[in-house]
């Protein structure tokens, strides 16, 4: 029993991370309810989970809402752009799913749409984590997300699998898993992409720390 309660044990560390991810998932869900704030809440979520991946988390709630406030405007702008593009692709997909086999034109158009959807998915995976760790323009974030996603394709596929498996588990296997949901996915993806973030920018948190120092 003493071993189970030892905070240095791997089992305790795993259970702690799971508990944290469930709590962060609740914060993310609540802050995403207005829909328009999904970008800011997702950026805040990744800000915290990337800190967790570095074992530098200190006060989950405080860090979450700090990142939420600081990134609200750029994250909302980024989210609205991605939402508009995603809605356009979804609407086109709904139409083409009924017409793709009618002739070669619709088949080629459907193939083009699928390719665009894949590229969109790649950008979506990296956009908010990058915004959580780097200061950049909206176009810069989108461009970097695409380039990073294509260059580190294996990590991209793993991250996509994390979200896909979680979605499958929630829908078909164990619905209460939604309590972990986005929080768990963000935490796993943060561990997967942390090394990449260092490779593309040295210390990606330096900008945030400089701002904190200036404020003090």
Identify the function of each model-found stretch:
Residues 1-100, 104-109, 113, 120-216:
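Helix-coil boundary and N-terminal low-complexity module in membrane systems
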């Amino acid at each position: 029993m003493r071993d189970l309660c030892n905070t240095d044990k791997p089992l305790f560390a795993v259970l702690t991370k799971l508990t944290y991810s469930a709590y962060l998932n609740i914060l993310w869900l609540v802050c995403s309810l207005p829909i328009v704030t999904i970008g800011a809440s997702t950026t805040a979520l990744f800000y915290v989970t990337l800190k967790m991946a570095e074992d530098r988390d200190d006060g989950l709630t405080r860090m979450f809402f700090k990142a939420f406030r600081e990134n609200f405007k750029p994250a909302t702008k980024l989210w609205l752009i991605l939402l508009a593009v995603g809605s356009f692709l979804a609407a086109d997909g709904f139409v083409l799913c009924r017409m793709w086999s009618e002739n070669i034109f619709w088949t080629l158009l459907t193939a083009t749409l699928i390719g665009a959807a894949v590229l969109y998915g790649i950008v979506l995976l990296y956009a908010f984590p990058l915004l959580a760790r780097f200061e950049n323009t909206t176009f810069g974030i989108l461009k970097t997300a695409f380039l990073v996603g294509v260059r580190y394709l294996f990590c991209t596929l793993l991250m996509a699998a994390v979200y896909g498996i979680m979605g499958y588990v929630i829908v078909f296997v164990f619905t209460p898993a939604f309590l972990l949901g986005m929080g768990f996915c963000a935490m796993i993806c943060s561990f997967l992409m942390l090394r990449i973030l260092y490779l593309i920018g040295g210390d990606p948190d330096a900008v945030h720390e400089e701002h904190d120092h200036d404020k003090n």
